[in-house]
Each structure stands twice: as structure tokens, then as C-alpha cells.
């Protein structure tokens, strides 16, 4: 059986988990409320501030789904209690970002500024024009938004210009010699 799927998810105080028909799980906390529909191959049980996920049968898929469901549920619990944060750095002459409400204005060397509309549940702040901090309760959505922003101008391998994650290492190439 999946080793991750065997571990119970500890529910901190202030967080409630409810399981509805069709494996629809709703997690409520101080920061947000998240809901997700999981595979019918797993069963959820919540008791004494601990949630456990068990596969319905011993098929390979059900066992794999139990580990996946446990990891997602753990991220949902952490997201509604603490929240998640992703930092992006912008490197390049004239490359800037500015957060305005639920929009992010990016100047990335195109002939026009790029306006990225943030989805509900994600907030952005720009402490410096070359730094973006994305915050949200949904880890999956936060990663998707960060990836979409990075996609506008990926770091190039010669000078390293572009949008990158804060902890990302960009391998640099040497310029062609004549």
C-alpha cells in the first residue's frame, strides 16, 4: 500500500473537514474554504482531529489514489490554516511588475504591457519592481498562476533574462566564439 496514503492527516484547531456524497471534501479554515471532488476509489473518515484515507479495494489504481488524495488533503488543510506563498524574480533591463488590485501589470520587453488577471483566491504584491509575491490557500492554483506568469518570458540561457522562481537555478550557456 502507498506509504503516504497510510499516514493520517492531522487537523489543526480552527479547521473543519466535511465529506459529502460523491467524495466531495470541503475544508474550512481561518484563511479560506476549499473543496475538491476525489476519486471514488478511496474512502475518507474524520475522527478526533485526524482524517484517514483508505482505498476501497487493493487495485494498483486505488492504492495510488489513496496516496494522492492524502497529499492533496494535507495541502488543503495547510492552505486554509497557514496559506501558501510563491516568489518570482524578474531579471532584465526594463523588466518590471506592478500589482494593482486583482491584476498584475508586467513589462517584459514586448511592444505592449502584459496584464495578467489573478484568479479568485490568489493575491499578488510587488515589494520591489523586480519581485512578485503570490499568496493563496490553494497550492495547486498558486503553482498554476506562478507557472503562467513565468511562461510569458522564461529565463533564457545566455544572460538569464526573464521571469524565474526565487529558488530556480538557470544554467547559463557560453556565447558562440568566432
Curated annotation (Swiss-Prot):
It comes from the Bacteria. Coiled coil: none annotated. Part of the 50S ribosomal subunit. InterPro entries: Ribosomal_uL6-like, Ribosomal_uL6-like_a/b-dom_sf, Ribosomal_uL6_a/b-dom, Ribosomal_uL6_bac-type, Ribosomal_uL6_CS. This is Large ribosomal subunit protein uL6. NCBIfam families: L6_bact (TIGR03654). Belongs to the universal ribosomal protein uL6 family. It comes from Francisella tularensis subsp. novicida (strain U112). Pfam families: Ribosomal_L6 (PF00347). This protein binds to the 23S rRNA, and is important in its secondary structure. It is located near the subunit interface in the base of the L7/L12 stalk, and near the tRNA binding site of the peptidyltransferase center. One of its GO terms (molecular function) is structural constituent of ribosome. GO terms for cellular component: cytosolic large ribosomal subunit. Gene3D superfamilies: Ribosomal protein L6, alpha-beta domain. Disulfide bonds: none annotated. The keyword Nucleotide-binding does not apply.
Amino acid at each position: 500500500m502507498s506509504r503516504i496514503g497510510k499516514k493520517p492527516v492531522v487537523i489543526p484547531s480552527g479547521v473543519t473537514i466535511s465529506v459529502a456524497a460523491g467524495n466531495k471534501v470541503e475544508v474550512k479554515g481561518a484563511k479560506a474554504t476549499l473543496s475538491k471532488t476525489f476519486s471514488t476509489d478511496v474512502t475518507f473518515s474524520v475522527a478526533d482531529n485526524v482524517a484517514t484515507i483508505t482505498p476501497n479495494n487493493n487495485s494498483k489504481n486505488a492504492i495510488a489514489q489513496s496516496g494522492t488524495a492524502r497529499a492533496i488533503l494535507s495541502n488543503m488543510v495547510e492552505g486554509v490554516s497557514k496559506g501558501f506563498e510563491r516568489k518570482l524574480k524578474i531579471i532584465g533591463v526594463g523588466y518590471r511588475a506592478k500589482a494593482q488590485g486583482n491584476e498584475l501589470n508586467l513589462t517584459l520587453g514586448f511592444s505592449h504591457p502584459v496584464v495578467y488577471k489573478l484568479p479568485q483566491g490568489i493575491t499578488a504584491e510587488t515589494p520591489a519592481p523586480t519581485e512578485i509575491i503570490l499568496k493563496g490557500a490553494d497550492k495547486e492554483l498558486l503553482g498554476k498562476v506562478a507557472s503562467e506568469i513565468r511562461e510569458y518570458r522564461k529565463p533564457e540561457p545566455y544572460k538569464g533574462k526573464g521571469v524565474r522562481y526565487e529558488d530556480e537555478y538557470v544554467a547559463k550557456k557560453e556565447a558562440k566564439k568566432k
